[in-house]
Amino acid sequence: MHWQTHTVFNQPIPLNNSNLYLSDGALCEAVTREGAGWDSDFLASIGQQLGTAESLELGRLANVNPPELLRYDAQGRRLDDVRFHPAWHLLMQALCTNRVHNLAWEEDARSGAFVARAARFMLHAQVEAGSLCPITMTFAATPLLLQMLPAPFQDWTTPLLSDRYDSHLLPGGQKRGLLIGMGMTEKQGGSDVMSNTTRAERLEDGSYRLVGHKWFFSVPQSDAHLVLAQTAGGLSCFFVPRFLPDGQRNAIRLERLKDKLGNRSNASCEVEFQDAIGWLLGQEGEGIRLILKMGGMTRFDCALGSHAMMRRAFSLAIYHAHQRHVFGNPLIQQPLMRHVLSRMALQLEGQTALLFRLARAWDRRADAKEALWARLFTPAAKFVICKRGMPFVAEAMEVLGGIGYCEESELLRLYREMPVNSIWEGSGNIMCLDVLRVLNKQAGVYDLLSEAFVEVKGQDRYFDRAVRRLQQQLRKPAEELGREITHQLFLLGCGAQMLKYASPPMAQAWCQVMLDTRGGVRLSEQIQNDLLLRATGGVCV
């Protein structure tokens, strides 16, 4: 475009027509390796659709037009509803059509469905992350509800397993698709849910009356929430629907929406239960056990979502560097910039390898070893990857310079979104304490680690040295070292996957960069070329 004073040139065009799946070599390989190659064609199809300018614009619109709380109608009657921009509904429709909320729970689900679903989740998260909150809670709650749906709600099974998104304000049994939320956090407790004060009193018909509050109650428009409340038998889990069996609204009062740093598209609410009615799931006192069943899956999604946003930030950075010229050459050809981008790509390689090994473990959790692998590495992955996200996106911003620091850039939304996954579903220290709990109390965990690490022993001296260092720490795993132990465990999990499946030069480069505490590692030109080719589908060299 020509202006009076100058001609605009050397300004890269936006990245808005790419295939989010085929451009990610590490992801394509991981999906096939971990048992979901049968979904590759579908992933390529939705990867192309999600990478369009139209899809990306929906993500922008949903965030610049946040949800609005509707407490009352014009006549003063309680509504307790939330109004969303149309872009939100289109994003949710796509997620449900692609079965990100229930793929693994279908009656005829194929082996590897958890892996395929993880890949679909990752692609959608690169477009808009807030809409993944209702999806991940629904995904985690569905298997529990398929076993424990209270008798008055047996007609919910079909819409729970449908591929439809239905935003109508109707009883769940009358809808084509359902969303399920969770209500745990209270003002005084946060992660300490045992201090919850919401009370539940058993009624004659077997239901319970709930009185109390929740301080962070995301997706208040859900058709039901799984809510923790105190009973005579201890902290318990309740199915609290939006509509009662007689068609009346339940007494769930929406007080205000949270004004959050990021996650702007998604509604998070403060609520009060004024004699709300709920149905007990399991037995009184089993609330923590039931919530933990779902918590592992939501924590995995937190790690996966942060990784996906890191991947999007990297894509924006390398695309910019490929087009932008400095000092007579493309930015991608400048040695220092090329090295920075290569190290970012290398970090993503290791994370992808571990996350999709984790997805396979979740897929095969009926096997005791796989279940233990998921139990140990899920909180470790959430702790490390969600922590890494913020500086990673900041690095991508630096690649773009000032244009990456302006509201027109996707990177600002990614940066604001990053902290939430470190906080939700248990903050960093909670994850590390959980890892220590598994290491101290789960039978067979040390045999599991030994088996995983012995399999690649002798292939890389940095890896072997790091294993010995972790073994020393685990002789007496002190709580104060929880973060260091968790971080080291995560790195070794990534390293084992890289040594097992990546090319030897790339695996050794990963181990040296990530495990050599001395630093100062220079990646060879060949490794840089390989990394950048894999990270762009062969576009940027």
Q: Where do the model's predicted regions map?
A:
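Extended, charge-enriched "interface" segments that sit outside catalytic cores
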Residues: 1-110, 129, 540-541
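Alpha-helix capping/hinge segments and adjacent helical runs
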Residues: 4-5, 11, 18, 22, ...
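Internal helix-loop-helix
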Residues: 80-171, 218-220, 424
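A short core secondary-structure module
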Residues: 207, 211-251
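A glycine-rich, basic-preceded beta-loop-alpha segment at the flavin cofactor/substrate interface
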Residues: 246-248, 270-298, 315-332, 466-479
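Flexible, small-/acidic-enriched active-site or ligand-binding loops
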Residues: 248-274
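C-terminal helix-coil-helix/basic helical segment that borders enzyme active sites and/or dimer interfaces
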Residues: 349-382, 398, 471-482, 486
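C-terminal amphipathic alpha-helical interaction region
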Residues: 455-541
